[in-house]
Amino acid sequence: MKDVKALKLMTLNDVLSQINGDMTLGIGTGSTMELLLPQMAQLIKERGYNITGVCTSNKIAFLAKELGIKICEINDVDHIDLAIDGADEVDPSLNIIKGGGGALFREKVIDEMASRFVVVVDETKIVQYLGETFKLPVEVDKFNWYQILRKIESYADIKVERRVNEDVAFITDNGNYILDCKLPKGIDPYKFHEYLIHLTGVFETGYFLDMADQVIVGTQEGVKILEK
């Protein structure tokens, strides 16, 4: 049986086939992108592509620069041709949860700008409903994070925790906190997102709804391509 890393690497050829010529490329954050990015950089170099990357986190921008990929800031581009990113969960409608790496706001900005948004996952990320195996991240202001937590818990039977890293509160690249929400089955993601996004102090949610154009899945049987 292949491990998760092997399943992710299986998707490599399908990911690389999306990259060509002159392109502004949105580069996602997380373990999948960190695994695939060196091969993407090698392809760009070998084929002489004129690729400019727009990165979703400081961490991935540092790695991309080290690999020789030309990087620019989001405000330096008018459009993004293709965004490639991982996901924490994908449901049957290709709605996804992202934000395990804490970069959900910047990921959403870049993925929404992209003409095409391709998601790369292994089969463990495919679920029947959002929240089945992964907590929904919500990026919030430090000032009133606890009041937001209480309001989220009052919405339904939701357990909410402020994210910590080695006993220290996790801070996003935007200087905010992350609240991780364990969702019960039956939560409507559209309604819950609307509730959250209208709470004062909520920066963004980890719901990426109706955004993915294609999901590339590494499975024990091979690569599966999911499209709407």
Swiss-Prot record:
SUPFAM superfamilies: D-ribose-5-phosphate isomerase (RpiA), lid domain, NagB/RpiA/CoA transferase-like. This is Ribose-5-phosphate isomerase A. The active site is at E107. Homodimer. InterPro entries: NagB/RpiA_transferase-like, Ribose5P_isomerase_typA_subgr, Ribose5P_isomerase_type_A. It is an enzyme of class 5 (isomerase). GO terms for biological process: D-ribose metabolic process; pentose-phosphate shunt, non-oxidative branch. It comes from Staphylococcus aureus (strain COL). Keywords: Isomerase. The gene is rpiA. CDD domains: RPI_A. PANTHER family: RIBOSE-5-PHOSPHATE ISOMERASE. It catalyses: aldehydo-D-ribose 5-phosphate = D-ribulose 5-phosphate. Belongs to the ribose 5-phosphate isomerase family.
